[in-house]
Design a protein with these regions (language model features):
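PLP-dependent amino-acid enzyme catalytic core
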Residues: 1-121
Length: 121
């Protein structure tokens, strides 16, 4: 598993401390086809129901994401992110967030015993 630059295709080890390529391109994660994602870090269930409502004769389906553990749909991304970095052995992360992403990531990081610093703009 390694990161590669979308722009110049340069490869970086998964343990790289860079947040982007030297050329300015963004990283993508390359995983072996047979490598499974391990999801063992959780702080609660990830199932939310669909509610059906009709407005002016049109049926709408509403997803009750507010029932996720931190009350935000951002739990889905944080769950995936933290499980992946926990799986590869990353022990410390930092992010910037004005709210839900920071709270969700910090909650899942705490469950995985990963040191998490959230910078609030």
């Amino acid at each position: 598993m390694y990161f590669y630059c979308e722009k110049c295709k340069k490869k970086y080890p998964i343990s790289s401390m860079n947040y982007r390529c030297e050329c300015g391109g963004m990283f993508h994660l390359n995983k072996a086809a047979n490598e499974e994602t391990v999801h063992d870090v959780t702080i609660g269930h990830m199932h939310t129901d669909l509610l059906s409502i009709k407005i002016d004769g049109i049926e709408y389906l509403l997803k009750t994401e507010n029932l996720l553990p931190t009350g935000s749909f951002k739990d889905r991304g944080a769950y995936t992110l933290i499980n992946e970095i926990h799986h590869v052995g990353i022990e410390k992360i930092a992010l910037d967030s004005a709210g839900n992403a920071g709270a969700s990531t910090a909650a899942y990081a705490a469950a995985a015993d990963i040191d998490c610093t959230v910078y609030v703009p």
